[in-house]
Structure formats: C-alpha cells, structure tokens
Amino acid sequence: MTGFFTILSFSLAALSVTNAAQILSVPKGAEVVPNGYIVVMKDDTSQQDFSSHRVWISSIHHNMTRRGLDGAGVKQTYDFDHLRGYSGIFDEDTIKDISNDPKVAFVEPDAIISQHVVVQQRKAPWGLSRLSNRRGGRNYVFDSSAGSGVWAYVVDSGVDIRHSEFQGRAVWGSNLVDNKNSDGTGHGTHVAGTIAGKTYGIAKKAKVVAVKVLNSEGKGPTSGIIAGINWSIRHARKHGMLQKSVLNMSLGGTYSAGLNHATAQAIKAGMFVSVSAGNDNINSNGNSPASERSVCTIAASTENDGKASFSNWGPAVDLYAPGHNILSARPGGGSQTMSGTSMAAPHAAGVAAYLIAKEGIPGNRACLRLKQLSQPTIRNPGPDTTSRLLYNGSGR
C-alpha cells in the first residue's frame, strides 16, 4: 500500500433545474458530510453581491434552525481573488434555493478525504542524491542558499514543528479540521521533512508553515482543503511572501471543480503549488487537484528511474520525482520510510523553494523552471506521459 490521500468526490451529473446552477452529484458509495455542501459563486460576483447573498443565507440559517436541522448554516467562507463561496450544512430545499440564485456558479457535496496506509521500512534516502545528479550518485549537491527566505505551506495532516529536523524553522499556521495541533498520522511531518528538513530535506533553510486539514484518522472534508488554500494565500499575502512561497498538497481524488478552482487561485496569486498524481496506476486526468493544469503534478519514480508501479500517469503529469522508499522525519523524533506520490510531490516543492531562493524566480514560474531543468530519464512512464525526472540544476 502507498502513501496518498483519496477524495471521494463528484461527477458532473446535474440535478439542477433549468437556468439554475449545477448541483454536482457524488458516485454511489462515496463518503460525504451529511447535508454538507460547497457553494461557489460566479467569477464576476462583486463583493457587494456576495455580502448580500450571505445576508440572505443567514436568514435561511434561522429558518432551518426553526425546522429542527441542528448545526445548520455556513461553516466556512472563502473570499480570495477570483474565488468567492462558502460551505456548510443545508437541507435539500435550501440547496435548491441556493442553486436558483443567478450569482451561484455551482454547488457540490462536501466529500470526505481519507488517508491510505503507507509503506514503512528503514532505508537510506536516495531521493536527494538522485535529483542533484544527472546519472545518479550517492551525494546530494546543492547551493548553500538552500531555500533561505522561502516559506513552505504544508497542507496536510499537521507537522511536528518541534522535530529537530526543522531547527526551529517550522511554525503552526492553521488548523481547519480539529482542535489538536499535532500530526496524528505522521504523513505531514514526513512531507515537511522532505521539503525542508536539515537531513532529509531539499530546501534546508526554508520555513515550514503547517496547515492542518486532515484529522488523526487521516480524514477531512473537501471544504477544509479549500479553506486551507484560502488561509495560506491570505497568510502569504499578509507577510508579502506570495511569490516566495511553495504550497504542497499530497492529496487528491476524483474530479472536484471547487478544489481545482481554489488551487488555481493560489498560483494566480503568485505561489508554487505541487500536488500528487495519485496511487492507482491510472490516468490522473480525472483526479483533483492533479487535473488542474496550472499546478505542478508529480508522479513517483523508483531508485532505478522507472515509474513506480502504483503511480498515476497521463498528460496531466508535469514531472516524475522520487517516491519509493523515501526516508524522512517522524512525529516525536526519528525517521520513517514511506512510499507514494505523496512523497514525490514534496521533492518538487523542495526544489522549487531551492530555485526561488537561488535564482530569484517568482513562485508561480517555478514549475516551468523545474521542467526546463528536468532530465528525460524515466523508463516506461505510461501512455501520453512525460519521461522527465526532477533535477535541481547542480551541474553534476
């Protein structure tokens, strides 16, 4: 089994009435938040119209409470750049009313994200040396700038910010899923260690910002992922770091228009975004956020420059990166080995942070730079899939 998240998401079957916004449906058996929905407004919705819509929703909330729908109403509001919307608990009649508002683009059920069990075994980290040597090698070769002055947003299961790997460079950003500011699965800490750990990391001087969207069972709603992206954009903008930030999401699943749209806004704002291609050995075009064309979608390679057997493939993939038997940090101290495209994506985030610091490129141009530096070395990458492997441009 391999390290990756799965979003049980949505098809494009419309349940809406004529001239109403689409209400996207979920496949049979999908796990969703009971009566939970994500509402996305049209791109041209003004701030004033959005405010008026929210006032109207507040009145609906009052009526739903009177009808006995406990906990009903808006739970999260998204208002950044070209994405305005919200998520919450609504009954069927209310959703029909919402979809009939001409300012609403679409409505989709709030699906549950779940974490897969990951492979763990002790083995030396080979990924760092591979990405800094064209023909492979045992040493990691890098510039001493090492990601200095760059922030890495890890949208995941949390990060053990006190781990010695981070040398005080990790901070807690936001928790959008529970009240436990810890990493209950170990996945987020492992990812952060690959990006910026002193031993296992690529950008060894970058700052890590933990954005928790998955609980100790490795689960959380799609609305929480969107909220995590929203928070990261706002936080980076507040500190003047949008073009000096990378955002990693080692998660994904079937197509979600809302998640793709939110992810694209981070890149438009100036950030680099890396995401996992997926672990089902299928075409990743049907997955989100991997199918969002503006993100850097990363597939997993092996020690021998082959496609990892579990890795997704397809034209949405931008690069391959090491994703098999990757050693990195573990919560509470020490290390552990994991495999998956979840491990490949942070390699790309780390190299992006490294190049942002070394070359001064803006974050949202880093994916193009990664592709320019990459090497066509992957054997049997899959149909209509790039053979290019991540490389940091060390000259070796």
Swiss-Prot record:
It comes from the Eukaryota. Residues 125-396 form the Peptidase S8 domain. The lineage of its organism: Eukaryota, Fungi, Dikarya, Ascomycota, Pezizomycotina. It is found in: Secreted. Residues 376-396 are annotated as: Disordered. Residues 376-389 have a biased composition (Polar residues). Residues 1-20 form the signal peptide. InterPro entries: PCSK9_ProteinaseK-like, Peptidase_S8/S53_dom, Peptidase_S8/S53_dom_sf, Peptidase_S8_Asp-AS, Peptidase_S8_His-AS, Peptidase_S8_Ser-AS, Peptidase_S8_subtilisin-like, Peptidase_S8_subtilisin-rel. Keywords: Glycoprotein, Hydrolase, Protease, Secreted, Serine protease, Signal, Virulence, Zymogen. Glycans are attached at residues 63, 230, 248, 392. GO terms for cellular component: extracellular region. The keyword Lipoprotein does not apply. Gene3D superfamilies: Peptidase S8 propeptide/proteinase inhibitor I9 (3.30.70.80), Peptidase S8/S53 domain (3.40.50.200). One of its GO terms (molecular function) is serine-type endopeptidase activity. Residues 21-116 form a propeptide. This is Subtilisin-like protease 5. Its EC number is 3.4.21.-. Induction: Expression is moderately increased during growth on protein-rich medium. Expression levels are the same whether keratin is present or not in the protein-rich medium. Belongs to the peptidase S8 family. The active site is at 156 (charge relay system), 187 (charge relay system), 342 (charge relay system). Secreted subtilisin-like serine protease with keratinolytic activity that contributes to pathogenicity. It comes from Trichophyton rubrum (Athlete's foot fungus). Pfam families: Inhibitor_I9, Peptidase_S8. GO terms for biological process: proteolysis. Residues 37-113 form the Inhibitor I9 domain. It is an enzyme of class 3 (hydrolase).
